C-alpha cells in the first residue's frame, strides 16, 4: 500500500487531534462559472454556535479559459480560534494538465503526487503542488494562515 493509496485521516471523537489538515475535493464548474463553498468551524462540543462563536471561510473556484483561480478568503467570525497551525490540501479535478501553480502571484514548487502528503500533519510551512495524470487531479498543499489566498492553476 503506497502513501498515495492510504486511507484518509480519521478521528474517533471531536478533538482527538486538535489540529489536523483539511482536504477539499473541488470539482470546478464550466468555463466562466464558479464552484463555491463556505467552511464552517466551531468548538464542536458546546453551544457556542448559539452565541455566534464560530468562524467561516469562503472558498471559490473560478473556471477561466486558461485555468482555475482558487480564492480562499480570510476567516470571518469571532469567539472561536483554530487550535493551531494546520495545512490545507486542495484536490482540483481537471481534464487538462496544469503548467504551473502560483500562490499570490509566486510560482510554487511541483512535487510527485506520492510525496505531496509527506509529513502533512506536522510540517505546516511547505507549499507545493502535484499533477496526477492517471486520476486527473491537481493537488495544492499550503499552510492555513487564516488570511486571503489566491491560487492560480494555469493550463499547458
Regions found by a protein language model. Name each.
Residues 1, 6-99, 103-106, 111, ...:
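Catalytic core of carbohydrate-active enzymes
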Residues 147-156:
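Low-complexity, intrinsically disordered segments enriched in Ser/Thr together with acidic residues
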Residues 106-146:
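Extracellular/luminal ectodomains and secreted, surface-exposed scaffolds of diverse proteins
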Residues 55-57, 88-90, 119-121, 126, ...:
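Generic alpha-helical propensity signal that fires on short helical segments
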Amino acid at each position: 500500500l503506497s502513501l498515495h493509496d492510504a486511507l484518509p485521516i480519521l478521528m474517533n471523537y471531536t478533538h482527538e487531534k486538535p489540529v489536523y489538515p483539511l482536504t477539499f475535493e473541488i470539482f470546478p464548474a464550466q468555463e466562466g462559472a464558479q464552484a463555491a463553498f463556505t467552511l464552517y468551524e466551531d468548538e464542536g462540543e458546546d453551544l457556542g454556535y448559539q452565541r455566534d462563536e464560530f468562524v467561516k471561510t469562503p472558498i471559490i473556484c473560478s473556471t477561466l479559459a486558461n485555468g482555475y483561480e482558487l480564492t480562499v478568503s480570510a476567516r470571518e467570525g469571532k469567539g472561536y480560534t483554530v487550535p493551531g497551525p494546520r495545512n490545507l490540501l486542495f484536490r482540483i479535478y481537471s481534464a487538462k494538465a496544469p503548467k504551473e501553480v502560483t500562490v499570490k502571484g509566486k510560482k510554487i514548487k511541483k512535487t510527485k503526487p506520492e510525496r505531496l502528503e509527506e509529513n502533512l500533519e506536522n510540517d505546516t510551512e511547505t507549499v507545493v503542488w502535484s499533477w496526477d495524470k492517471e486520476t486527473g487531479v491537481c493537488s495544492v498543499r499550503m499552510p492555513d494562515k487564516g488570511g486571503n489566498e489566491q491560487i492560480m492553476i494555469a493550463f499547458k
